[in-house]
Amino acid sequence: MNNVFEIINQARRKNKLKRELQDNQKKIRDNQKRVVLLENMLDYIDPSMTTAEVITIVQNMKGDYEDRVDDHIIKSAEISKSRRDISRKIRDLTEADKKANK
């Protein structure tokens, strides 16, 4: 019976991680879009139109968004690994429970 509770607990954790992974992937997409936007802005901004400081600011913003994308990609990999570990544990617990009930 303890295995049943553990299986339920692990399944809930797995589902929570799945939702977190989806949320993280959305953040990756959003930040990648921002990077593209800023790249396009850099194509249109000209020193004669604005000051060189504006270009520097936009470049810094672009770098910040790229760093965020990298951070979210790393976080997604960590979450995926946790989900795989939980799936493996659920499978092992289920098999052990089946053997114990035979």
Swiss-Prot record:
One of its GO terms (cellular component) is cytosol. Keywords: Coiled coil, Cytoplasm. It is found in: Cytoplasm. InterPro entries: DUF496. Pfam families: DUF496. Residues 7-34 form a coiled coil. It comes from the Bacteria. Belongs to the pole-localizer TmaR family. Pole-localizer protein involved in the regulation of several cellular processes. This is Pole-localizer protein TmaR. It comes from Aliivibrio salmonicida (strain LFI1238). The gene is tmaR.
